């Protein structure tokens, strides 16, 4: 039974990968807007987080560069750039893991992330519309990876809307 399930899983992955080839080929640059809950898991200094990202469609292997700016209602800010990879599950669903070193500022009495450099790792799961815009959920982890004396880290839970830049410019015509 295990072998049968493994074979079915491999077949499903191959079919998904083949059907996603056309989807992968026509993706543009994106402007991504996100809002969500900062420090939702540890609850040391919770707040609302707003994020803006510019996601380029230029690829190095399967990796795409992006820039990010996040502001939190507790006064923290994160500015950085990193890489992401879009993994297509058929025509409509996209899983996007990403990684970005960021410059952090805004220590509060309740939460000190321990160093000015914070690394953000994120996993996003999104639905892709006909116009190629995406609506998704993501979970992010911020950590200084041991660069500071302390490394408390924190997580964010976000709702993301990514709009192709071509669609964005059409809104203002």
Describe the predicted segments one by one:
Residues 48, 152-173:
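Outer-membrane beta-barrel "beta-signal"
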Residues 23-56, 167-171:
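Outer-membrane beta-barrel initiation region
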Residues 1-27, 166-173:
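Cleavable N-terminal export/targeting peptides
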Residues 29-39, 62-73, 97-103, 137-143:
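Transmembrane beta-strand segments that form the barrel wall of outer-membrane beta-barrel proteins
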């Amino acid at each position: 039974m295990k072998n049968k399930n493994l074979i079915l899983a491999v077949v499903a992955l191959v079919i998904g990968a083949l059907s996603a080839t056309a989807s992968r080929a026509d993706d543009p640059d994106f402007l991504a807007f996100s809002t969500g809950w900062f420090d939702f898991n540890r609850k040391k200094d919770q707040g609302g987080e707003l994020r803006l990202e510019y996601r380029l469609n230029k690829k190095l292997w399967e990796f795409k560069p992006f820039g990010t700016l996040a502001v939190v209602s507790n006064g923290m800010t994160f500015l950085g750039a990193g890489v992401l990879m879009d993994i297509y599950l058929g025509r409509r669903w996209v899983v996007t893991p990403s990684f970005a070193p960021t410059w952090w500022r805004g220590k509060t009495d309740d939460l000190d992330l321990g160093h000015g450099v914070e690394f953000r790792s994120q996993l996003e799961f999104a639905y892709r519309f006909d116009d190629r815009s995406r609506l998704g959920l993501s979970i992010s982890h911020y950590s200084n990876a041991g660069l500071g004396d302390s490394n408390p880290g924190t997580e964010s839970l976000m709702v993301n809307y990514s709009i192709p830049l071509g669609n964005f410019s059409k809104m203002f015509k």
